[in-house]
């Protein structure tokens, strides 16, 4: 399975999360996953909620349109983005 997969109602992303980074960014490929750096620490779900907020801004969707399908408690996650309004260039390059 690739890092970015199109499905009928949006995109499925396989992510590797780097918490406690200096800034929020989509770093690029990390093996067969997309590496995302976020500033939040991995404590009490702070990293997950920060990740959802960050992805919501990047894809211009509401937070309710982003679902963590797998990896709620780990660094390796599978996230579904329902009907993205915009696709960031870092992700668009991987879908081709």
UniProtKB/Swiss-Prot annotation:
Signal peptide: none annotated. InterPro entries: DUF167, YggU-like_sf. GO terms for cellular component: cytoplasm. Gene3D superfamilies: YggU-like. NCBIfam families: DUF167 family protein, PRK05090.1. Belongs to the UPF0235 family. This is UPF0235 protein YggU. It comes from Salmonella newport (strain SL254).
């Amino acid at each position: 399975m690739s890092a970015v997969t199109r499905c009928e109602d949006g995109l499925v992303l396989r992510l590797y999360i780097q918490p406690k980074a200096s800034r929020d960014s989509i770093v690029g490929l990390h093996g067969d996953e997309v590496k995302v750096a976020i500033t939040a620490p991995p404590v009490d779900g702070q990293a997950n909620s920060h990740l959802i907020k960050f992805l919501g801004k990047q894809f211009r969707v509401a937070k309710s349109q982003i679902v963590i399908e797998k990896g709620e408690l780990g660094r390796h996650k599978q996230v579904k983005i329902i009907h993205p309004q915009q696709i960031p260039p870092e992700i668009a390059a991987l879908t081709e």
